[in-house]
Amino acid sequence: MKKLNLTDKRNPDYFYSEAIKTLRTNIQLSGQSIKTILITSCYPNEGKSDVVLSLAQEIGSIGKKVLLLDADIRKTAYAGRLGVEEEVKGLSQLLSGQVGLQEVIYSTNFPNMDIIFGGPSAPNPSGLLSENIFKVFLKEIREYYNYILIDTPPIGTVIDAAVIGRCCDGAVFLIEPGNVRYRDAQKAFKQLERSGC
């Protein structure tokens, strides 16, 4: 496993940090069987990836082994956001059989946190994610982590999160106040429920 030094230039305020700690505590209180957690939103640009990164860092800071899995294989952003300049392998390459599991997991300078990047944009993301290989992959890595946080595309715009939800123990659905219509949030939430997550 290759180690990356990631750069996080965000400077969250007290209230944001406390909200992340509350979310972490609620996840812990959900029970030890809740390990694989899908995190999605209704629309793009609601702050989902920031929350996933903050939550992964928070979980790692209390001594729990966490994997941040970027499952947005349509539009990955973590490598650029975290200052990674070298080419990294990712989930899309793993699912399409181009690379093996050990080639996509990167350890980081954040305590107890590993990351799998999304990889190059895939031509048929929901098709790749619905293949049995994704389910087998999650089952295999589950043994090595206390928590796996899966950052998905917004469920209100594409089906990928619902496809991924079939393989998860739980979900966090983020809604940006004032920007998401109630009807759209309800529709997206019902789609997530139908996935069994």
Feature roles, as predicted:
Residues T36:
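Walker A (P-loop) ATP-phosphate-binding motif of ABC ATPase nucleotide-binding domains
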Residues S126-C197:
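Conserved catalytic-core segment of NTP-binding enzymes
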Residues D50-V51, L55, D160:
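Hydrophobic positions on the alpha1 helix immediately C-terminal to the Walker A/P-loop
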Residues K64-K65, C197:
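Short phosphate-binding/catalytic loops that engage adenosine nucleotides
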Residues K2-S17, K21, T25-Q32, S41-E46, ...:
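P-loop/Walker-type NTP enzyme "switch/lid" segment
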